[in-house]
């Protein structure tokens, strides 16, 4: 399994990986969410998330295992890569 050290912007809380991301505006935040939705669908692993204006809060957990799995670490890493494109 991945080490949390490989995801320095994520926190492990309540049996989930969690991260808050900020964007220039709502359009960038929503565009980011659309891009992540495509990644999540391909992986068949979907985040719990919320959006308020330019802020997106993400929570990743694997309900089947009752906690964090390799799938969560993999999706978190992919989310970080997508965020790099939007954080320019």
What do these predicted ranges mean?
Residues 1-88:
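Charge-rich alpha-helical segments
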